[in-house]
Amino acid sequence: QRQMCIRDRYYATEATRLLESQRATYYLQSAERRFAEEQARIDACLSPNTLAPLKEIVERRLLTEHLDEILAMPDGGLVVLLDTDARADMERMYRLFRLVPTGLDALNKVLRAYVTDRGKIINETTLYESKNTQTPSAEMAMSWVNQVLDTKSRLDGVLATSFQGDKSCEAAINEAMDTFINLNTRAPEFISLYIDEHLRKGTRFADDTTALEPVLDKTITIFRYVHEKDVFERYYKMHLTRRLLHNRSASDDAERSMIAKLKVECGHGYVQKLQGMLNDMKLSEEVLRAFHHTLEREGTSLPLQLNVN
């Protein structure tokens, strides 16, 4: 018991000393060494029965009592690590915080706030550019969606490597993404414009068919967060109509592929009208081709030709 009291006082003092450095990475590296040293001491000369109480002392004094302070440190705190994509340091932080009951709750609180704040910056920058126009440009939509996709891609990487795919961390990221995406009232329109820019004939995106499918898949990952899917449908229908009427659709296959993705997310009823528009256009083209074929076979020519879609 006396030995435990000595170790308890030692680690309380050690925590105070380490906190003065205000360097989270140094703090956690030191904590990691202390865990290893206690394990080696027990293996060498102490009873295995002392492992649990000693472990509790080190975890409580070095971690549990200072979680928020460690996370908020200006050098190596979680926000700094996320900004600099310091994945090894984040992995150490996750691994140690996971040892104590409230560790991941504290980490996820900061993670959630970080993602929300960075998302708000994306929103504010884009919405400031579009505030004086009722119809945002494709460039604005592309900028917003690309920034959101880049953010999600980076966070997915952090989740997989640093946070070991932890479900609670994934939930924190998703909650924050959901929050800031839906704070942008133009998100449904931006996503539809982004898709339109990729499916329109003549754009640099539509001409590269091998790269198109992965882009559409990534777009769906953002679409999932949108609450106002009826608003998105309205814009998507308008943009699809414009592509079809102006003969600007890159390909029927690409259009149907995108609609199939929306169907998986929202069901048949959601895409029924969109599928109907494509089917009507295809039928119109087939009837027109058959008509011209008949004219050619009969050697008949018309003084005036019109294409009506």
Model-identified regions with their sequence ranges:
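Eukaryotic scaffold/interaction segments
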Residues: 1-3, 8-309
